[in-house]
Regions:
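Active-site-proximal beta-strand elements of phosphoester/diester hydrolases
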Residues: 1-10, 14, 91
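Cys-nucleophile CN-hydrolase/nitrilase-fold catalytic domain and related Cys-dependent amidase chemistry
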Residues: 15, 24-91
Length: 92
């Protein structure tokens, strides 16, 4: 099993920029990789006020993770700040 751990600088509270950068990294290392492990809260960075950064459980970030994993025939793991029923979670 080939596992790649990705660690990067995060563009604070900018999911589009962070996902685009992760997309480039995954594409560059996709050959033969079975699992990519992304940094914790890779799409936004940490924040003491999750109200401003939390995503829905069907966010563009999570859809991207599923799509990229299907395209590359691999697994992608990483956590995202998610809001559900008025509560906030660091969901892995």
């Amino acid at each position: 099993m080939k596992v790649i751990l990705l660690q990067t600088d995060i563009c604070w509270a900018d999911p589009a920029a962070n996902v685009a950068y992760m997309d480039k990294l995954i594409s560059a290392h996709a050959q033969g990789t079975d699992l990519f492990v992304l940094p914790e809260m890779f799409s936004t960075g940490f924040c003491t006020s999750p109200e401003g950064i939390a995503e829905s459980s069907d966010s563009a970030t999570l859809r991207w993770m599923k799509q990229k994993a299907a395209e590359r025939n691999c697994a992608i793991a990483g956590s995202v700040s998610v809001e559900e029923n008025g509560k906030f979670y660091n969901r892995f």
